[in-house]
């Protein structure tokens, strides 16, 4: 059973556990294999509607982090800002299940599209999101990192 718990500063250690189970991503994004509480705290300080972030628990264990933005002020579109599954929970269909729940909610709200960004070098993410029906629409640079913008129309 999946429980979505709204994230915030009180969830730093839960997020840290999930993040540090994925050193590949941390290396790409942060330039180091392990993140520290302050790295996560910086992310969490900016979370306010229409941006939402959750720690997802499965059978009481930290299983994933998911973040979405219902209305990006830059393009007016909803964005999936972050989805990370704890290493121990990967390859079990959890990412697909979480994404599908998000897509279903967006459909109910009559959003016709969803966007997300993938860092250059994140081959597993390219593969996963392509399988979910997303297509690359452009490449941008943010803070010195190339980000591939993907979009899916519903």
Model regions and ranges:
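Conserved GNAT acetyl-CoA-binding A-motif
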Residues: 106-118
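A generic structural signal for beta-strand entry/edge sites
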Residues: 75-77, 113, 145-147
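Acetyl-CoA-dependent GNAT
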Residues: 2-88, 99-101, 105, 140-141, ...
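Conserved acetyl-CoA-binding loop of GNAT-fold acetyltransferases
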Residues: 130-138
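Conserved glycine-rich acetyl-CoA-binding loop
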Residues: 80-82, 86-100, 109, 120-127, ...
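Conserved beta-strand-loop-alpha-helix junction that forms the acyl-donor binding cleft
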Residues: 116-126, 141-147
């Amino acid at each position: 059973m999946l429980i979505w718990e709204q994230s915030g500063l009180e969830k730093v250690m839960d997020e840290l556990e999930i993040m540090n189970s994925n050193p590949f991503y941390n290396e790409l994004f942060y330039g180091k294999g392990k993140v520290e509480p302050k790295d996560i705290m910086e992310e969490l300080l900016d979370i306010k509607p229409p941006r939402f972030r959750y720690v997802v628990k499965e059978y009481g264990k930290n299983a994933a982090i998911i973040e979405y933005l219902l209305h990006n002020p830059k393009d007016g579109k909803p964005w999936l800002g972050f989805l990370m599954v704890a290493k121990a929970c990967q390859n079990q269909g959890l990412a697909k299940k979480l994404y599908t729940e998000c897509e279903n909610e967006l459909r109910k709200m009559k959003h016709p599209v969803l966007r997300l960004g993938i860092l250059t070098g994140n081959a597993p993410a390219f593969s996963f999101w392509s399988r979910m029906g997303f297509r690359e629409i452009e490449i941008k640079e943010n803070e010195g990192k190339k980000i591939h913008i993907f979009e899916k129309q519903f």
